[in-house]
C-alpha cells in the first residue's frame, strides 16, 4: 500500500512539474507531449523504485559471475576436483547459451559432509546478490517440506505451483532439492514436465532455470571406487567422471527410494550425476584452517597440536587405514569451537565476584 502512494506521488510530480520533466527528457513542446513524457518518466521511475524496494530479475540482483564461481569452488571446496570440473563448466555453458533446449539438471551424490549443500550455496551466491535468501532460489528439504505421506496429492499441487510461480518471476531461478533420495517417487515425477524439452509450460519458459538434486544415495559406491584408488596407490585426482557416472545412474535407478524408476532417469533428464568423494584427513585439515580464519583465529592454523586434536576428535574409515572422514567436514565447526573453548582463558573468580 505504501508503494502505491509513493507511485501516485511520483506520477503527480512527473505530470505537473514540467521543469522536472524537461530536466530529465528535454524541451517540452505541448500538452500532449507533456502527458506522453510524464507517463514515460513515471513508468521508468516506477520500475526503478520497485527494484529498489524489491528483488528484480536483472542486474544487480541477478549477476552470474563465472570467474568468482570458479575461484570460490577452487578455494573454498577441498578434495573435490570432479565437482569443480563438471559444475563450473556445465553452469557456465548453460548460462551463456542463448537458446538452451532444457533446464540444467544436476544430481549431487555423496556421503554427508562432502560439500553438496556447500556447493549449492556457492552457486546461488554467484548467481544472485542475495544468495540463498533470494526469492528466485527455492531450497526444498524433503523431510521438512513434505513430511506427511498421506498428503502426496496435495504436495504435488503445492510443488508445481511453487516452481511455476518462481520461474514466472525469474527464468534464471534455481531449485535445490535437499534429501532428494527421500522424496517420494510421485513428487519427483511431478516436476518432470519442468525439466523436459518443452519451450513453455503454462506460458512459462523453464529452459534457463537450474535444478539441483542433493542425495546421500550412491555414497557407498563413490567411497568404494575412491578407496580402491587410494589402496592402489594412485592419486584421487586421476579419477574421472566416467568412473562414477554410470554407477550412479544405475544405482539411483534401481535403489529403493529416491530416484527409483523415476522418469527423470529413464527419460535422461538429469544432465550430470556429480560424485562428491569422501574426504581424507588432509582435506579435513584444510576445512579446519578455513574455519579458524573465518573465526578470526588464523594464528591457530599453524598450531599443529591444536589442529591434530580437532582431527583426532573425528571418526574415520575403513578401520584398517582410517583414511577417510566418516562425516567429511560437517562436524569440523563444532569440534573446532570445542577445542578453542578449552584453551580460552576463563574469567577469574575476582572478575566474576565484581560482576555480581
From Swiss-Prot:
GO terms for cellular component: aster; endoplasmic reticulum; endoplasmic reticulum lumen; perinuclear region of cytoplasm; plasma membrane; spindle; spindle pole. Residues 1-18 form the signal peptide. InterPro entries: ClpA/B (IPR001270), P-loop_NTPase (IPR027417), TOR1A_C (IPR049337), Torsin (IPR010448), Torsin_1/2 (IPR017378). GO terms for biological process: cellular response to misfolded protein; chaperone cofactor-dependent protein refolding. Disruption phenotype: Worms show defects in asymmetric divisions in early embryos. In particular, mutations specifically affect the reestablishment of asymmetric PAR protein domains in the P1 cell at the 2-cell stage. One of its GO terms (molecular function) is ATP hydrolysis activity. It comes from the Eukaryota. ATP binds at residues 110-117. Keywords: ATP-binding, Endoplasmic reticulum, Glycoprotein, Nucleotide-binding, Signal. Glycans are attached at residues 125, 250. It is found in: Endoplasmic reticulum lumen. May serve as a molecular chaperone assisting in the proper folding of secreted and/or membrane proteins. Belongs to the ClpA/ClpB family. Torsin subfamily. This is Torsin-like protein. It comes from Caenorhabditis elegans.
